Design a protein with these regions (language model features):
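Donor-sugar nucleotide-binding helix/loop cap in glycosyltransferases
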Residues: 1-210
Length: 210
């Protein structure tokens, strides 16, 4: 299951977990302590499944390689993956770079779990920016018109909401309100602005726009 199909794993929750661990000693925390810090016991009293959102987010973070789980003294700990770049792990820059870090992890060639997210992002970015499908109803209609339903499997409003959340967080679309309703527009400008310095690393290199 990818973040596209796991509605409990959204950017704000994963960001909250990562921000906590960035400041934690050794960038690690016991799983039980982390769970109770982010989702206090009082809030989950008498719930059939105490912390489904926390568990879903941790699972997705481990699966994509953002975090790892380690056994220590008969307890599990959640740790920021030491294989991430130094800048991604720094307390001063890790939070700001998290959209890039997650995009890199999601779209790496060997991450088959997020293949469907990559397809949806590529499809939405290919839509006409002047007349984009900006609501779930419009997306549903456009998917049917273009006969890509089997490919994208965008079959309900929940999946659309996840697309909106994740593409927006990574800087691949933006949204605005009109008549009390949210509309989205495919636009990777924010993502490109964040990544130009990594794409063109040579000092003084000129970029020609045609």
């Amino acid at each position: 299951m990818s973040v596209l199909k796991q509605p409990l794993a959204n950017p704000s929750r994963i960001r909250g977990i990562y921000r906590y661990l960035l400041q934690a000693k050794g960038q690690r925390e016991k799983t039980k302590v982390l769970a109770r810090s982010l989702s206090p016991d009082k809030l989950v009293e008498n719930k059939p499944t105490p912390r489904p959102m926390f568990e879903a987010c941790i699972k997705e973070c481990i699966k994509c390689g953002l975090l790892i789980e380690e056994e220590k003294e008969e307890q599990t700990e959640i740790v920021i993956n030491p294989d991430l770049s130094e800048e991604a792990r720094k307390p001063g820059t890790g939070d700001e770079l998290l959209p890039n870090t997650l995009a890199d992890l999601f779209f790496t060639l060997d991450n088959e779990d997020e293949y469907d997210l990559g397809l949806v992002c590529a499809w939405y970015l290919s839509q006409d920016v002047y007349e984009p499908p900006g609501t779930w109803e419009a997306v549903e209609q456009k998917v049917a018109e273009q006969k890509v339903g089997e490919l994208l499997k965008m079959s309900n409003n929940t999946l659309y909401g996840q697309m909106d959340d994740w593409m927006g967080y990574m800087g691949l679309l933006w949204g605005h309100a009109l008549g009390g309703k949210r509309f989205i527009i495919p636009d990777p400008t924010l993502y490109l602005k964040r990544n130009l310095k990594y794409l063109f690393k040579q000092s003084g290199e000129k970029i020609l726009l045609r």
